[in-house]
């Protein structure tokens, strides 16, 4: 009897596997230009391989029934999309990351809607066009009510602007119900936030370069959630920000050379800021920005901030514009910030493991620690490095650190 049950179980598995393999197809697009036709033709679960050529989308206007960043969410928005994946799951993979190019010519470049298990990888997304409606959450990739893995994608040069709208075209935006897994992407020279998350969106963002844009490198708003590990955020107006009632965990990021602030939390947001390097930002490095924001700031190196004339916050390392009692602040190196290391809070040096000394990087903008660095083995005693020793302060400390 047991053998018969086992045999029946194995037959059932074989039948399931066979059914899946029969139902899922791989479609290769290497000629022509109508990628959307292939997307429309593909069935749920199919894979589309995009050849090494440029594909130009024919943009289509539509009315977005919800507004991502309006006070009244049910505000209709006039927008456009280049490619749309709707009510099914697809894997869209380029055959050459640099040469498989999707030029979207639209506000919502690649738009995932009600797509429960899709993936986008190994290609370039470029050429977005700003919509005239300022409420449109334009970005190279936009997802709503979708689970999308976005790996090894170059999101570049979506920099079209129009005079009547301040915002431009961003990099990757999560809308209502989006669950995004963004890894090893190069998001550069776009016209608004690098990554933005709106109502009900969540994202895991790892090992990305987010560079040279307007807005924030990573902006998390409303009730969105974000975990960001090992990213470089540079050349934006602002670095990594938590707004509204959002929840952000930001570990081991290099937030450097942005025009305004480095990392802030405002509204009623929670932010866990650990093992980051916040270096050479134009105004303040790190700031609790409201009395209701809360979180933890530990194991960070906050240095050389304040090189620019004051714009959005004082030119200091740490600015307290909130309720300091709601923040755990310890084991940080805060040093050499232009107008002081601290503002609107007493000097934290030699309190809770905080120090104010040269962290001892091996070179300019190379944040590896020298062997004699005061940051080695002096981090939070309850945070361990990958080898089990007490954590280092900075990028290469803690369990999420990248090995060098």
PLM region spans:
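Right-handed parallel beta-helix/beta-solenoid
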Residues: 16-47, 51-67, 359-363
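Solenoid scaffold repeats with emphasis on beta-solenoid/beta-helix
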Residues: 48, 83, 90, 100, ...
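Feature marks extracellular polysaccharide-active and adherence modules
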Residues: 51, 93-95, 113, 121, ...
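Right-handed parallel beta-helix/beta-spiral solenoid domain characteristic of secreted/periplasmic
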Residues: 52, 56-63, 69-136, 157-159, ...
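Acidic glycine-/aspartate-rich tracts in secreted/extracellular proteins
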Residues: 53-56, 96-99, 307, 334-340, ...
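Extracellular beta-strand/beta-solenoid scaffold signature
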Residues: 64-83, 104-111, 132-142, 162-176, ...
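Predominantly extracellular beta-rich ligand-binding scaffolds that present long acidic/polar faces
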Residues: 239, 247-370
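C-terminal accessory segments
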Residues: 352-402
């Amino acid at each position: 009897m047991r053998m018969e049950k086992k045999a029946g179980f194995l037959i059932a598995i074989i039948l399931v596997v066979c059914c899946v393999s029969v139902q899922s197809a791989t479609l290769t697009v290497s000629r022509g230009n109508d990628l959307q036709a292939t997307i429309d033709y593909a069935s749920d679960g199919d894979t589309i391989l995009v050849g090494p050529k440029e594909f130009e989308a024919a943009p289509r206007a539509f009315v977005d029934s919800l507004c991502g960043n309006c006070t009244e969410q049910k505000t209709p928005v006039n927008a456009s999309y280049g490619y749309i994946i709707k009510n099914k799951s697809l894997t869209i993979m380029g055959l050459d990351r640099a040469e498989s190019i999707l030029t979207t010519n639209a506000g919502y470049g690649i738009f995932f809607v009600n797509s429960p298990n899709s993936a986008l990888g190994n290609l370039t997304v470029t050429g977005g066009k700003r919509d005239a409606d300022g409420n449109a959450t334009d970005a190279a990739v936009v997802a709503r009510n979708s689970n999308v893995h976005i790996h090894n994608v170059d999101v570049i040069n979506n920099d079209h602007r129009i005079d009547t709208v301040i915002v431009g075209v961003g990099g990757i935006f999560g809308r209502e119900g989006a669950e995004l897994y963004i890894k090893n992407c190069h998001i550069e020279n776009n016209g608004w936030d690098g990554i933005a998350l709106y109502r009900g969106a969540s994202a895991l963002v790892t090992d990305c370069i987010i560079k040279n844009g307007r807005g924030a490198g990573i902006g998390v708003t409303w009730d969105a959630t974000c975990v960001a590990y090992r990213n470089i955020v540079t050349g934006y107006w602002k670095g990594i920000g938590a707004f509204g009632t959002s929840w952000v965990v930001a570990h081991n990021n290099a937030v450097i050379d942005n025009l305004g602030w480095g990392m802030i939390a405002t509204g009623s947001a929670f932010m866990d800021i650990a093992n980051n390097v916040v270096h050479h930002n134009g105004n303040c490095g790190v700031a609790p920005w409201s009395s209701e924001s809360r979180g933890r700031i530990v194991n960070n190196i906050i240095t050389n901030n304040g090189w620019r004339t004051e714009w959005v916050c004082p030119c200091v390392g740490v600015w307290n514009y909130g309720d300091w009692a709601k923040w755990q602040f310890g084991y940080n190196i805060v040093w050499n910030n232009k107008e002081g290391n601290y503002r609107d809070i007493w000097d934290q040096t030699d309190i809770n493991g905080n120090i104010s000394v040269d962290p001892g990087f091996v070179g300019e903008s190379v944040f590896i620690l020298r062997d004699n660095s005061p940051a080695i083995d002096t981090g939070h005693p309850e945070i361990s490095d990958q080898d089990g020793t007490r954590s280092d302060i900075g990028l290469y400390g803690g369990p999420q650190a990248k090995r060098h």
